[in-house]
UniProtKB/Swiss-Prot annotation:
Top-level taxonomic group: Bacteria
Gene Ontology terms: biological process: diaminopimelate biosynthetic process; L-arginine biosynthetic process; lysine biosynthetic process via diaminopimelate
Cofactor(s) this protein cannot do without: Zn(2+); Co(2+)
Residues noted as binding Zn(2+) 1 in the record, renumbered to the chain: H74, D107, E170
Pathway assignment: Amino-acid biosynthesis; L-lysine biosynthesis via DAP pathway; LL-2,6-diaminopimelate from (S)-tetrahydrodipicolinate (succinylase route): step 3/3
Protein's name according to its UniProt entry: Succinyl-diaminopimelate desuccinylase
Record keywords, A-Z: Amino-acid biosynthesis, Cobalt, Diaminopimelate biosynthesis, Hydrolase, Lysine biosynthesis, Metal-binding, Zinc
Cofactor binding remark: Binds 2 Zn(2+) or Co(2+) ions per subunit.
Subunit composition and interactions: Homodimer.
EC top class named in words: hydrolase
Length: 397
């Protein structure tokens, strides 16, 4: 029996599945075909929720006596954009100049392909890990992330699954393989502020109440002063205004409403609840000020709506997990990886509630771009890193 020990062949099979979120596109089926010869039992539960597409997921486990390691990731990919702009077709897995092209090559079908190859080599050389290995793979990471990892974890846990550690195979390296392990993530929270004014003629502002003026004062209060100066493990908390809309095409009309949307990435100085309280306090205080609304006697009339669910800040302090992975990276590429909490959120934010989790995968330079691609040499190196990690974490090195 031929085992899936070649990461490039594994990746090609996955790229050729057009699994643009939320479509499964055959990617989970291709993955199941790779895993079954390795002794994995595979389930593919489908989760639903009103107003969202049904999502197929995959949970596979190879059982043994000992600790339980989970590899997590996703097979769904972002849209390709203008397909004519691609040098090579986005779902053909063509190779040129030592690189494989295709949507999902680095984010993150490549990571999955390498982990499968690493397990296959370990089975071939050592008979398998002294413990259990599972793959928790969703088709809903690039989408709303409602019917994916969060529900798959709940589903598996309800069936008695427990994990001792997890690696998420997201592309964590900025420039070269081995640059960075993600050992935590900042929290994330989004909201919208709508200021209610009174529409009127721009030439007669005394007869109107310009909501844009009120909104300027509220936004200013969100941006100043800074929330903090950062901590030992995290960057400073940062708030970005991501949109401002008045829905007003006329230049001589004061609008009736103005809305600003914002996102805040917060460090371990805060919780989602304390960030929300701070923002409420800043807005309430700013609403009373007259700086942008001279002559107005009443506070700014505003509504604040929190959007989506917050992502909570976390930091993984599991020395065995972090040190074993860092040691595997150094053995393969000869350098110490940076331990970082930078960047955006990932599905690790859900996994951290079940077991210690870190993230490590390929180089992310071309993710989500036209001509997304990965060096074949990086696929081989990442496979060797994962294989060394599996051997050492299970005490078989």
């Amino acid at each position: 029996m031929t085992l899936p020990t070649d990461p490039a062949a594994n990746l090609a099979a996955l790229i050729r599945c057009a699994s643009v979120t939320p479509a499964e596109g055959g990617a989970l089926g291709a993955l199941e075909t790779m895993l079954k010869p390795l002794g994995f039992l595979v389930d593919r539960p489908v989760f639903s929720e009103d107003g969202t597409p049904d999502i197929e997921n995959l949970y596979a486990r190879r059982s043994g006596n000992g600790p339980h390691l989970m590899f997590a990731g996703h097979t769904d990919v972002v849209p390709v954009g203008d397909e004519a702009a691609w040098t090579h077709p986005p779902f053909a897995a063509e190779i040129a100049n030592g690189e494989m092209y295709g949507r999902g090559a680095v984010d993150m079908k490549g990571g999955i392909a390498c982990f499968v190859a690493a397990i296959a080599r370990h089975v071939e050389n050592n008979g398998g890990p002294k413990g259990s290995v599972s793959l928790l793979i969703t088709g809903d990471e690039e989408g709303p992330a409602i019917n994916g990892t969060v529900k798959l974890l709940e589903w598996a846990a309800s069936r008695g699954e427990k994990w001792d550690a997890s690696i998420v195979g997201e592309p964590t390296n900025p420039d070269t393989l081995g640059d960075m392990i993600k050992i935590g993530r900042r929290g994330s929270l989004s909201g919208s502020i709508t200021v209610n004014g009174r529409q009127g003629h721009a030439a007669y502002p005394q007869l109107a109440d310009n909501p844009v003026r009120g909104l300027m004062g509220l936004v200013d209060a969100l941006l100043h002063p800074v929330f903090d100066k950062g901590t030992k493990d995290f960057q400073p908390t940062n708030l970005e205004v991501t949109s401002i809309d008045v829905g007003n095409p006329a230049t001589n009309v004061i609008p009736a409403k103005a809305t600003a949307t914002f996102n805040i990435r917060f460090n371990d100085t805060w919780t989602a609840e304390t960030v929300q309280a701070e923002i409420h306090n800043r807005l309430d205080q700013a609403a009373k000020r007259k700086k942008y609304r001279p002559g107005k006697k009443t506070p700014v009339d505003y509504d604040l709506v929190w959007r989506d669910r917050p992502s909570h800040v976390f930091l993984t302090r599991d020395d065995k997990l972090v040190d074993t992975l860092a040691g595997s990276i150094k053995a393969a590429v000869g350098k110490e990886p940076t331990l970082s909490t930078s960047g955006g959120t990932s599905d690790a934010r859900f996994i951290k509630d079940y077991c210690p989790v870190v993230e490590f995968g390929l180089v992310g330079k071309t993710m989500h771009m036209v001509d997304e691609r990965v060096a074949l040499a990086d696929l081989e190196t990442l496979t060797r890193i994962y294989q060394r990690f599996i051997e050492d974490w299970f005490g078989q090195g």
